[in-house]
UniProtKB/Swiss-Prot annotation:
Keyword Signal: no
Record InterPro entries: ORF2/G2P_dom
Gene this protein is translated from: II
Keyword hit for NAD: no
Catalytic activity: ATP + (deoxyribonucleotide)n-3'-hydroxyl + 5'-phospho-(deoxyribonucleotide)m = (deoxyribonucleotide)n+m + AMP + diphosphate
Enzyme Commission no: 3.1.21.-, 6.5.1.1
Protein name in UniProt: Replication-associated protein G2P
Purpose of the protein: Isoform G2P plays an essential role in viral DNA replication. Binds the origin of replication and cleaves the dsDNA replicative form I (RFI) and becomes covalently bound to it via phosphotyrosine bond, generating the dsDNA replicative form II (RFII). In turn, viral DNA replication initiates at the 3'-OH of the cleavage site. After one round of rolling circle synthesis, protein G2P is linked to the newly synthesized ssDNA and joins the ends of the displaced strand to generate a circular single-stranded molecule ready to be packed into a virion.
Family as reported in the entry's similarity comment: Belongs to the inovirus G2P protein family.
Amino acid sequence: MADGTCSFCGEPTVYFFPGGLCVSCTSKNARIRMQEQPTQSRELSAFDASVGVMQAATRRTEIAAEKIQKNKRVVGTSVREFDAAHPIALTPEGQRAALALGLVHYKTSDTRASTTGTVTIEIDPLQARAQRLRKSVITGARLHDQEAKKGSFRGAWYFLTLTYRDGSDSSPRDVSELFKRMRGHFNRLKSGRARWNRESFRYVWVGELTQRFRPHYHVMLWVPQGMFFGKVDQRGWWPHGSSQIEKARNCVGYLAKYASKFTAITAAAFPKGFRTHGCGGLNTESKRELRWWKAPKDAREALGGEADIRKAKGGWFDRLTGEFWPSPWKVTFIFGRTFAWKVVQL
């Protein structure tokens, strides 16, 4: 192209505009011919692709962190403090839905700051199951030992260990069938001796898992003086494996040791449908005391030490007086997780 000509149309001109265009081509928004760019090498293309993958992974991590922060639970703190640290913008419909779930503080008719809020905790069902087991087993063993000493019963505590042999099938009813046969043997012997009239078939047991995740049971059994049970596997009462029985020195400490081994991990791995513990033979007063200790601390304080506490919808009540204690805690299930919350004063 000769000098003094338009770079697009090739017509001679005196005035040039950006891109070497004449007045006519500039006014018509003429397309500027661009120089061809060199082809990008394979190494550079691979580098760009890796950078893109890294950026995408970083963004996914940021999104996951944002979700975790958004769903972070409030433990032991007021909702006002949580909202101040993690403000969330909600629509009016969203605010009503969150209010119904107890996840935000309740507003009063006054336009000033609210004086109430909620405390929310997450409940681990497996951990709660392990805690109930420890409380039931240790308290039941203590009450049995107190009854035996208070009533001046003659006898001794024996430890019975039950295991399954390799290849043997296990069933949730195996332990129940064993105690059914042992109780029948106990009652037959009791009916033939007058000195055993006041005796009861007392036992407390707790489950455990072996290294192969097979159930394994430890039983504390009260044997009156002169009564004989023998080995339950040789009598055919436990045909699933072997048994071992020996005299005990510290019945409460023995069961407390095995109850403390039962954790949330054990509860998760325990076969479905199998019971994990049991207690039998307590008198009426000891049963009432066991239920009292298994009730929440707030219910025990509200209803008193002599109450026969029973569970009712929305709280607990004393069966002796009919007094009802409404629980301040409400339970909500969100995406398979269990949350308990209550309204508190800020």
